[in-house]
Amino acid sequence: MCSKFKILFILIALLFVWSCADKEKKISKIVEADMEMQMSNAYKEGYLELQRGDVLLAAKKFNEAELLFPQSIWAAESAIMAAYAYYSQNYYSDAVYELERYFETYPNHKDNAYAHFLLGMCFYEQIVDEKKDLKSLLDSKKQFEIIINEFSSTEFAVDAKFKINLIDEILAAKEMYIARYYLDKTKWI
């Protein structure tokens, strides 16, 4: 009985050694042209998925394009498109995350005006009314002020000024809401 186990053990050991023996190995090289083609394909797939309405897959493809070739001109574009994909379907927190990552990675990119505008719009779209928290309101105003101060010659500056006027009206409504509350409670300041 014991010898049967020894023979079985030896056969298994030989099979293991034989399967691990050196065979001709195929080493695949990643050619830069292939990487650029993969990056381009990922960007195109992301764009098609965005048009179809599958924003999660689109954002994944845009992020994939950015990761495949981070030094290309398409990397920053892919990061913005991933954020836009989330924004287009009201995934504002995901869009904010993508845009903050974009600003860390590409602080001096030519599309920063649009990225600030998109970030401002993400915060702006989360404004409910004057009775709610002011954080998204103030964050939105901050982004629009950056556009006016740093990118005043872009087409986004006009819209940013308009949005700031609307935000100021909401802030004034908030002050009126607070004043009415204290008047109703007869809590004179």
Where are these regions (language model features)?
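Acidic, polar-rich low-complexity tracts and alpha-helical solenoid repeat scaffolds
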Residues: 2, 18-189
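Bacterial N-terminal signal peptides
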Residues: 9-17
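Bacterial N-terminal signal peptides that target proteins for export
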Residues: 1-8
